[in-house]
């Protein structure tokens, strides 16, 4: 993926941690993750590609779950090629806020998955998406943002999901 990103002149790719065995200490999975992402980071640095490290839900992983986890892992790897991102679904599931991500990651927060609960179109579920948007803007965020819309309800007509996302943005933002 790093080589493909370089070839396509894509500045960044998203990565996540995977998970450790749930019957082993979390520290073991953490160590494996740090070593693996560190190896990828060294290669990504040489290729001029940034790695956007994403947290996952506790139901998916036992490694990176919160913004504090992300900040700690990024600090331990200590590579300019590794930065953090936030997914609204994972953030809310972990009981965190946008302010937590900005406080813990600072300028290392460089990508946002702006989606409603269950990776749905903003406004299709129950997250306070307008509030989230306003908080992001209040922090002066100028990084990248994407809509990770992957709920099965959109499989039949993905174009409608895009249209609904654009409509939500027009109705709720100045973008």
Stretches found by the model and what they are:
Residues 9, 64-86, 91-175:
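Histidine-acidic metal/acid-base catalytic patches
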């Amino acid at each position: 993926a790093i080589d493909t990103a370089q070839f396509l002149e894509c500045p960044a790719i998203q990565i996540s941690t995977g998970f450790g065995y749930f019957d082993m200490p979390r520290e073991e999975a953490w160590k494996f993750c740090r070593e693996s992402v560190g190896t990828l980071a060294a290669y990504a640095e040489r290729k001029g590609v940034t790695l956007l490290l994403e947290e996952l839900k506790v139901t998916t992983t036992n490694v990176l779950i919160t913004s504090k986890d992300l900040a700690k892992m990024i600090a331990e790897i200590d590579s300019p090629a590794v930065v953090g991102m936030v997914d609204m679904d994972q953030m809310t599931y972990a009981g965190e806020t946008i302010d937590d991500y900005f406080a813990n990651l600072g300028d290392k927060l460089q990508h946002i998955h702006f989606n409603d609960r269950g990776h749905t179109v903003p406004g299709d579920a129950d997250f306070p998406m307008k509030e989230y948007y306003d908080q992001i803007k209040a922090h002066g965020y100028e990084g990248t943002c994407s809509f990770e819309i992957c709920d099965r309800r959109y499989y039949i007509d993905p174009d409608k999901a895009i249209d609904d996302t654009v409509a939500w943005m027009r109705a709720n933002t100045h973008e």
